[in-house]
Structure formats: structure tokens, C-alpha cells
Amino acid sequence: MQHIRNFSIIAHIDHGKSTLADRLIHRCGGLAEREMSAQVLDSMDIERERGITIKAQTASLQYKSQDGTVYNLNLIDTPGHVDFSYEVSRSLSACEGALLVVDASQGVEAQTVANCYTAIELGMEVLPVLNKMDLPQADPEAARQEVEDVIGIDASEAVLASAKTGMGIDEILESIVARVPPPKGDPSAPLQALIIDSWFDNYVGVVMLVRIVNGVLKPKDKILLMASHATHLCEQIGVFTPKSQPRPELSAGEVGFVIAGIKELEHAKVGDTITLAGKPAAEPLPGFKEVKPQVFAGLYPVESSEYDQLRDSLEKLKLNDAALMFEPEVSQALGFGFRCGFLGLLHMEIVQERLEREFDMDIITTAPSVVYEVEQRDGTVVTIESPSRMPEIAKIADIREPIVKVTLFMPQEYVGPVMTLCNNKRGVQLNMSYHGRQVHLTYEIPLAEIVLDFFDKLKSVSRGYASMDYEFVEYRSADVVKVDLLINGDRVDALAMIAHRNNARYRAREVVSRMRGLIPRQMFDVAIQAAIGAEVIARENVKALRKNVLAKCYGGDISRKKKLLEKQKAGKKRMKQVGSVEIPQEAFLAILQVEDK
């Protein structure tokens, strides 16, 4: 065990984490030259294209250090994005050390800080690495100062590296061997293994990525998953180099994979503890928690006949994505579909994109909403995931909305616009500090405001320089109301939205006027209204198309013309009673694009 080193890499999006991982694998001979592809560990297409890591991946590398000892290095690649922060904390808790990769030309960013604090709380050894030193604008001194100011760790020994050219790779490996402590654990104690990640393989079922903390695991052992209380027979174990290689056993301190013929990803939850069914451990490893979706949206197939296909696609995605939740939902406007829960906006976009790309689905997505807690007059508390499920106003005693703590980093020239944006989003400033040129702001903002378009707005007011990270704080009472949209007097459930009372009228007027341009003209007038309860707060009309019925009358008596006009009027009236209005897809998106004042 003295020769094992478990480490992970912490970095902001695009700071060169996956490239550095490729270099380390290459240097230790994990893959032959011909098998090296860019970003070896990012196995999903969408991960490569967006340049982000979504699932944790590992590589066990053999490294011969300069004094001739051979070390077994386990690299655990972690996701870097806020939505996946639970996966990050589990990946980090499997390691004793972390490489903090900072782009020498850009300095420290928000997500790096959040993950780095997690690592420090877990008591890990953090080794700073200043990457991208091959760029002409790299400024190692400023970056080093920033690491010390913002994160508060000593960066005097930071390795200067460039993953692109391969500079500094040997120094990184040497410092891992020298500074990261070997794992602690007792091979003779009862088995305790932490599930770092799990995914579904079409051939063998669920593959679990585990870190053995105590004990030894061998094939043919009967294992027990402590959170879901399921027992399975362990069929195959091994390590990734990043290719899978079977092993006769995994013992304390090692990282590898376990295949046990599990069919449901539900059973192998990230963060759960595996132990032996015959000789179980007294208690599971600390830190396991159920991941709760924060953002909900309705997904509907464009063709209603594709409902079953959508369900199958979602089930397949769920095999690899335990945080995705969905349940059937019926909407009068859109037919049958699903109400889906996501960890955050990036997660939602990725699920949509994977549905369209991997399963070839055409889907309509309704406006994302967050979960509200509604206390009713009879004292019961219900959680509302969709605006259409909000109880009647008369029954509601109090509505509480989720508040998140947002950490923002930006160059100081953008502080003004960013603060204005946060205040417009009903934010409350908690803290502000200067670190060199960078400013660190902390705000509490309702999650509902972030879900709509906060991230896009933040990028535009700061010209792309600001970065953000958020975490859930609590539910707080809020003065929010449900705004219904009516088309010709019929409520359209899929278009309902929940808004803050101060913004409700403004948003209602905006949506209604935008809808007016999107609903095609009919043979009769179409009234578009927005209402809070029974009170209509905004209205627009889509004027009817009319045929000129008098065109065939040359001269003639006025009564003849009157008769034709009356006949047309009666026809229109009859049409209006039976006519239904097709609502185009753009109309649903109109709700998303309404700017708040």
C-alpha cells in the first residue's frame, strides 16, 4: 500500500484538465501511441464537443520514479461543472491528493474554488499546477499570487507545465509521489468500498467504479450495497488503464471496477458503500446522500405517436444518469409527455441534446421551473414541481421558494454590471472581496431567477469573463403568484408560469404580446389573456382574417350586402365556438425569452 497514490485533477472548464490527464496516461505508458486520442477519459461525444467531463473516469498507471521505485498511480477524473458537484465530492473523497490545475493566462475561476474547498475540507493534499505555460500571455507570477490569495494554499512550489507540449509532466508525477500521502486502510478489516461512479454497459449490466477503503474484494464474493440493501454476486473485478484489465483481487487503497450483474442503476448509487454479505461492515462510509433534482421541465414528443419511444429513450438515459428523474404527465395542449427533474441547467441541456442526438427524438421542452413548497391552510405542505399543479389561491397559506448561494468571480471592471444583474434578479449581497485584479462576490438569489437566463446574461454583461458556482441554501417565503395563460378563454396548462408578484404584470404583458406574433391568424378573433386567479392582467387579440364576401356584388341593393355580411358574421360566430387554435412550438419558448425588468 505504501506504493499506491490516489489523486484527482481539479480544474475549471477549458483549463486543460483532460489534456493533462492524456499526457499523464501517455507518459506512464497506459495506452500505446496508436490508441491515444485527444481526451481519452471523456468517452461521450458530447463530453468531447463541449470540452466538459460529465462522468468520473479512472486510469491506473504504473510509474517508475527517479529513485527506481515503481508506484501505482490511480487518476480519478472528476467533472468540473456545478451541476455535478455531488459526483465531484464523491470522486474527491476516494483520493488522498489533488492536482489543482490553473490556466496561467486566466487565473482562478469560480468552479475551481468550489471544488478546491471541497478537497481541502476532505483533508486532501492539494498540489497547484500552472498549466498552459506555452501561451505567450501566460503570467505565472500573477496566477501563483491568485492561488495563494483566493484559495489560501502555498503556491511557491507550484509546477509550471504545459499539457499541450508536455512540459513539466515529469515534475508533476514526481511531486505526486513525494507529496500525496499513501492511502490508509486495513486489508484484514471487513470490506468497505465506496462507489465513485456507476454506469450501464449493454453487455454486462451496471459497472461500478469503486475505491476499496478496507478489506479485500474477490470475484465470486457475495456483496451487499448498504444504501439500497441489495445483494449481488461479484462476477468480475479489475482496473482501467484506461482500458479494462481484469484482476484476481482488489485490496484496501486500490481503485478499480466491479461488475456484479446488476440490472438497475438505482441499486448502485454513487456514494454508496459495498460490503460483503457474509461479513458486513458495521457501518457505511460517511457522506452518502440522495441527489435531488433542482430544476424541472416537461418533455413532450413532437409526434404523439413517439411517446413510447421517448419513454424508452429516457429509461436508457437514466441507466447512465441516476440523477435524472421523470414521470408521465398529460397536458391538454401538448398531449402525453414526461415531467423531468434535473440537477441544473447544464444537466437539462445535456439530457435534451443526448435525446436528440443519440436517440433521434424530436422533443418540445416547456419552460424550466423549480420546486416550490406550498403550505396550505389546513397545515399540510406540498411540493410543487409544475406551475399547473399549484393549488387554488384560496387554499394557500404560504409559498416558499428555493434560495441558492451564488459565488461569482470576475475582473474588477465588470463588478458594476454584474451587481446590477444580481439585484435585478432579487439577489441579496452577502460578501465582496478583492484579490488582485479579480473580485469575488457572494449573493443569495432565488433559484427560479437563475434557471431562466441568469448564466447567459452574466456572460454577456461581463463579456464572458465572469464565472459562477451555486449551491442550495434553504426554502424561504416568497410573494409569488401563478400566472395562467388563456387562449379564447381556455387555460393552456403548459404555458402557466410562476412569477414574483412585482414582476408578474410585466412578464404577463411581455409574454402575451410575444404570443400575439406567434399564433397564426385564424378565421375568427383569438383572444390571448394572462390571469392571476380570476383577474385578467393582460390581453392581446389576434385579428381574424376575413374574406371579402361583397366582391361579387356590383351595385345592387344595400339589403343584399347586409344579408351576406350577416351570414359571414354568423359563420364566424359558429366557427369561434367549435374552432380550436393550434399553438406552435415557438409560443412555448416565448415564455423563456421574456426579460425581467
Swiss-Prot record:
Q: What is its EC number?
A: 3.6.5.n1
Please provide the record's keywords in A-Z order. Answer: Cell inner membrane, Cell membrane, GTP-binding, Hydrolase, Membrane, Nucleotide-binding, Protein biosynthesis
State its location(s): Cell inner membrane
Domain tr-type G residue range list: 2-184
Coiled-coil annotated residue ranges, if any = none
Cross-referenced InterPro entries, in alphabetical order?
A: EF-4 (IPR006297), EFG_III/V (IPR035647), EFG_V-like (IPR000640), EFTu-like_2 (IPR004161), G_TR_CS (IPR031157), LepA_C_sf (IPR038363), LepA_CTD (IPR013842), LepA_IV (IPR035654)
Q: What is the protein's name according to its record? A: Elongation factor 4
- Say which species the protein is native to: Bordetella pertussis (strain Tohama I / ATCC BAA-589 / NCTC 13251)
What gene makes this protein?
lepA
